[in-house]
């Protein structure tokens, strides 16, 4: 396997499952740190701030700094701020998204007369919130969604994800949003911009083909699939565009890198 100069790394299913570290995750990050190889954690989670994500990883023994975390909320806020500085926004979502938006100088409003409607995962979503978002889009606001994951794994099972909430507004208005998170290029290009390396020197590491591996393929970087999450080795073998590599787990990746 090629030795890359930097890595983009998925979290759920790659680094951890729920609140438990996946075997090999801490060792993989330790290896990268010992070799002074830069890496970023790229997550579609818009509800958490980078500090919270890093704290969770550190609690599991996986070394992480807040500035190594790229969330769909951060990428969304930067996308809007670059396109329309100081724009007004109506949003669905948590503090991770609201803080990211205001940090970029965007103005949050609680009505449908705005420049942008942004939908992020909102665990307190209501009919009224969906109605305001729908009216905002109908009024001409640009429609943005942090990510298109229709379901998310929780202790109870797979629960509705942000893609499911987004679809309510999309179906009602007939307007398709601009998606920011994986597998879309927007969040990946943001992460690559931070690394500032040639794309041939960067690899994406993840477990889910449709999200993680496709995110790498969509921005022309190599991909490393680990069989510790959703997509199995058997499913990978059936893909018309396979990942560059597939491994049982991150321990196998370390062994390859140490050769």
Swiss-Prot record:
It holds the Pfam family Hydrolase_like. Keywords: Hydrolase, Magnesium, Metal-binding. The keyword Magnesium applies. Its cofactor is Mg(2+). Catalyzes the dephosphorylation of 2-6 carbon acid sugars in vitro. It is an enzyme of class 3 (hydrolase). CDD domains: HAD_Pase_UmpH-like. The lineage of its organism: Bacteria, Bacillati, Bacillota, Bacilli, Bacillales. The gene is nagD. InterPro entries: HAD-like_sf (IPR036412), HAD-SF_hydro_IIA (IPR006357), HAD-SF_hydro_IIA_hyp1 (IPR006354), HAD_sf (IPR023214). GO terms for cellular component: cytoplasm. It comes from Staphylococcus saprophyticus subsp. saprophyticus (strain ATCC 15305 / DSM 20229 / NCIMB 8711 / NCTC 7292 / S-41). Belongs to the HAD-like hydrolase superfamily. NagD family. This is Acid sugar phosphatase. One of its GO terms (molecular function) is phosphatase activity. Its EC number is 3.1.3.-. Gene3D superfamilies: HAD superfamily/HAD-like.
């Amino acid at each position: 396997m090629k030795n890359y100069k930097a890595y983009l790394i998925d979290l759920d299913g790659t680094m951890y499952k729920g609140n438990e570290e996946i075997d090999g995750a801490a060792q993989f990050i330790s290896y990268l740190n010992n070799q002074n190889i830069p890496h970023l954690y790229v997550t579609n989670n818009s509800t958490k701030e980078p500090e919270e994500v890093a704290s969770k990883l550190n609690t599991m023994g996986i070394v992480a700094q807040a500035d190594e975390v790229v969330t769909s909320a951060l990428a969304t806020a930067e996308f809007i701020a670059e396109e329309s500085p100081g724009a007004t926004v109506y949003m669905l979502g948590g503090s991770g998204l609201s803080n990211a938006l205001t940090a970029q100088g965007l103005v949050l409003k609680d009505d449908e007369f705005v420049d942008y409607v942004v939908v992020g995962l909102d665990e307190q979503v209501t009919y009224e919130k969906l109605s305001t978002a729908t009216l905002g889009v109908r009024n001409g606001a640009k429609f943005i969604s942090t990510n298109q994951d229709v379901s998310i794994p929780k202790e109870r099972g797979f629960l509705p994800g942000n893609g499911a909430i987004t679809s309510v507004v999309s179906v009602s208005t007939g307007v398709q949003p601009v998606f920011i998170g994986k597998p879309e290029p927007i969040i990946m290009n943001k992460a690559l911009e931070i690394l500032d390396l040639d794309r041939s020197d960067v690899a994406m590491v993840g477990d889910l083909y449709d999200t993680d591996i496709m995110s790498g393929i969509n921005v022309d970087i190599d991909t490393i699939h680990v069989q510790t999450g959703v997509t199995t080795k058997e499913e990978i073998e059936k893909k018309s565009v396979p990942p560059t590599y597939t491994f049982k787990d991150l321990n196998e990746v370390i062994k390859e890198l140490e050769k």
